Amino acid sequence: MGRTLESKKQIVEEIKGLLDKADMALVLDYQGLSIKEMSDLRSRLEQSSGICKVTKNTLMRKAINGDATWSGLESLLNGTNAFVLVKGDVGSALKAVQAFQKETKKSETKGGLYEGKLLTQDEIKAIAALPSKEALMAQIAGALNSITTKIAVGVNEIPSGLARSLKQHAENSES
């Protein structure tokens, strides 16, 4: 027995709510994945601020209809799709999906959408290869710390150099 019109409307509203909170959407071909494997993917995504939603393409089409941010997904809505919606740390969620795909060798990323731009598989891999936000902040902090250290050494070196020059000049004057 199929879903009622009311339950379909609820699903569309739920998807709209999830999309409103999401920063990125990935479309995966999940054909051939077992329930256990889908559960594994979902648990990996929970740890990295992502959610995996399996729904009919027609319901997703209704959810993105009229929404300029997500309308680019329209071209990916064919076949058996699972939708990964990511809020926050996009890189860690992409790494979780890629690690899952590498282990199972059953799922394939069709594409994605980030900030209204349709992404290819290569672009998604490039984003996943970027360091996490925490790693970037640590690199910036390290760079700033080294700059301040160099400035402090340089500022300290000026009076020391002057003192050495004066001492040498005084020794030369005495001779």
Curated annotation (Swiss-Prot):
Q: Which GO terms describe its biological process?
A: translation
Q: Which GO terms describe its cellular component?
A: ribonucleoprotein complex; ribosome
Supply the SUPFAM superfamilies for this chain.
Ribosomal protein L10-like (SSF160369)
Supply the alphabetized keyword list: Ribonucleoprotein, Ribosomal protein, RNA-binding, rRNA-binding
Molecular function per GO: large ribosomal subunit rRNA binding
InterPro entries attached to this UniProt entry: Ribosomal_uL10 (IPR001790), Ribosomal_uL10-like_sf (IPR043141), Ribosomal_uL10_bac (IPR022973), Ribosomal_uL10_bac_type (IPR047865)
Q: Which residues form a coiled coil?
A: none
> Pfam families given for it?
Ribosomal_L10
CDD domains according to UniProt: Ribosomal_L10
Q: Does the keyword Lyase apply?
A: no
Per the similarity annotation, which family is this?
Answer: Belongs to the universal ribosomal protein uL10 family.
Q: What does this protein do?
A: Forms part of the ribosomal stalk, playing a central role in the interaction of the ribosome with GTP-bound translation factors.
* Listed NCBIfam families: PRK00099.1-1
Entry-linked PANTHER family: 39S RIBOSOMAL PROTEIN L10, MITOCHONDRIAL
Quaternary context = Part of the ribosomal stalk of the 50S ribosomal subunit. The N-terminus interacts with L11 and the large rRNA to form the base of the stalk. The C-terminus forms an elongated spine to which L12 dimers bind in a sequential fashion forming a multimeric L10(L12)X complex.
Q: What is this protein called?
A: Large ribosomal subunit protein uL10
Q: What is the organism of origin for this protein? A: Prochlorococcus marinus (strain SARG / CCMP1375 / SS120)
Q: Which gene encodes it?
A: rplJ
